UniProtKB/Swiss-Prot annotation:
Fe cation 1 binds at residues 22, 55, 58. It comes from Mycolicibacterium smegmatis (strain ATCC 700084 / mc(2)155). InterPro entries: Ferritin, Ferritin-like, Ferritin-like_diiron, Ferritin-like_SF, Ferritin_DPS_dom, Ferritin_prok. GO terms for biological process: intracellular iron ion homeostasis; iron ion transport. Residues 5-150 form the Ferritin-like diiron domain. The lineage of its organism: Bacteria, Bacillati, Actinomycetota, Actinomycetes, Mycobacteriales. Homooligomer of 24 subunits that are packed together to form an approximately spherical molecule with a central cavity, in which large amounts of iron can be stored. It catalyses: 4 Fe(2+) + O2 + 4 H(+) = 4 Fe(3+) + 2 H2O. It is an enzyme of class 1 (oxidoreductase). This is Ferritin BfrB. Its EC number is 1.16.3.1. The gene is bfrB.
Length: 181
């Protein structure tokens, strides 16, 4: 079923690492959502529960890509996640840092695919690059709104309810193994 020799590329090894990063991001967003739920901030909680599913779907898109390329896939464990936040802004800042880190990882994946002459891999990464521009922009805006709102958390809740509702499935997104949730 799988070609174990295909994992010999640096790009495929980095995809395996990225699967771990995406699953970790999913769990981190669940931890952030639970924090917001516990603080009675339902709009922020709902937003981050949805973000957790999105990150899970990203991991499964990477899995599907490796399966489609006949590369053996190993589902990894995850890195530790942070569960303790002093303020809602701290949780949002962590989410922004996480998105910036993922952007660096995705950019590296695209560069390695190009360096290795893996045109299929490079093309596959283009959707993720576009997605990261959107994710960093959204988290940057959310942190700025939190800064402007100060201690009035209802302003943040109102903004999230009004401006950050789910956009629906992206028809250009890669297929996720097992289907997107």
């Amino acid at each position: 079923m799988t070609n174990s020799g295909a994992l010999d590329t640096k790009f495929h090894a980095l995809i395996q690492d990225q699967i771990r990063s995406e699953f970790t991001a999913s769990q981190q967003y669940i931890a952030i959502a639970v924090f917001f739920d516990g603080a009675d901030l339902p709009q922020l909680a709902k937003h981050f529960y949805a973000q957790a599913l999105e990150e899970r779907n990203h991991a499964m898109m990477l899995v599907q890509y490796l399966l489609d390329r006949d590369v053996e896939v190993e589902i990894p464990g995850i890195d530790p996640v942070c569960n303790n936040f002093t303020t809602p802004r701290d949780a949002l800042a962590l989410a922004l840092d996480q998105e910036r880190t993922v952007t660096e990882q995705i950019s590296r994946l695209a560069s390695v695919a190009r360096d290795e002459g893996d045109h299929l891999g490079e093309q596959f990464m283009q959707w993720f690059l576009k997605e990261q521009v959107e994710e960093v922009a959204a988290m940057t805006t959310l942190v700025r709104i939190a800064d402007r709102a100060g201690s009035n958390l209802f302003h943040i809740e109102d903004f999230v309810a009004r401006e950050m509702s789910a956009a629906g499935a992206d028809p250009t997104a890669p297929r996720a193994a097992g289907g997107a949730l």
